Curated annotation (Swiss-Prot):
Binds 23S rRNA and is also seen to make contacts with the A and possibly P site tRNAs. Belongs to the universal ribosomal protein uL16 family. Pfam families: Ribosomal_L16. It comes from Tropheryma whipplei (strain Twist). NCBIfam families: rplP_bact. The gene is rplP. This is Large ribosomal subunit protein uL16.
C-alpha cells in the first residue's frame, strides 16, 4: 500500500521550505507511543511503507498503528548523462517534508516494551534521527 496522491493539480512543484521547527503535528493524538523527528529530511513513500511493515510485523495482532505523515510532494530528477537546461526533470518519487518535532507514527493497544521495540524497528528504516515519546495527558490549564 504505497502512499501516492490519487490526483494532483500540477505534476511538478517547487522545493519546500525546510527551515524551522514543525508547526503542527507535534503531539501524540491517537496512540500511546510515537516517533518524533529530531532532524529534518525527506521521507519517501517507500520508507514510510517499510517502517509501517516493520512495526506491524513486530506488533502482530492486538495493536493499532497510525501514520501521521503523507508523501504529497513530487521530487523530480533528470535522466543520467543529460545536458543542462531543457526544462525540469520528470517526477521520480513522492516525499514528505519532515521537520524536527513532527510525530510521524503512533502505536497503541500493546505493552510498553513491545511498542518501544516496534517503534525502534521503524526508526531504523527512516533517514533521520528520531526518538520514542509517550503520550502526555493535558488538562485545559496545561494547554
Amino acid at each position: 500500500m504505497m502512499l501516492i496522491p490519487k490526483k494532483v493539480k500540477f505534476r511538478k512543484q517547487h522545493r519546500p521550505n525546510r527551515k524551522g521547527m514543525s508547526g503542527c503535528g507535534t503531539r501524540i493524538v491517537f496512540g500511546d507511543y510515537g516517533i518524533q523527528a529530531l532532524s529534518r529530511a525527506y521521507v519517501t513513500n517507500r520508507q514510510v511503507e517499510s517502517a509501517r511493515i516493520a512495526m506491524t510485523r513486530h506488533i502482530r495482532r492486538g495493536g493499532r498503528v497510525w501514520i501521521n505523515i503523507y508523501p504529497d510532494r513530487p521530487l523530480t530528477k533528470k535522466p543520467a548523462e543529460t545536458r543542462m537546461g531543457s526544462g525540469k526533470g520528470s517526477p521520480e518519487y513522492w516525499v514528505a517534508n519532515i521537520r524536527p518535532g513532527r510525530i510521524m507514527f503512533e502505536v497503541s493497544g500493546v505493552s510498553e516494551s513491545l511498542a518501544k521495540e516496534a517503534l525502534m524497528r521503524a526508526i531504523h528504516k527512516l533517514p533521520l534521527r528520531a526518538r520514542i515519546v509517550e503520550r502526555q495527558e493535558f488538562d485545559d490549564a496545561g494547554l
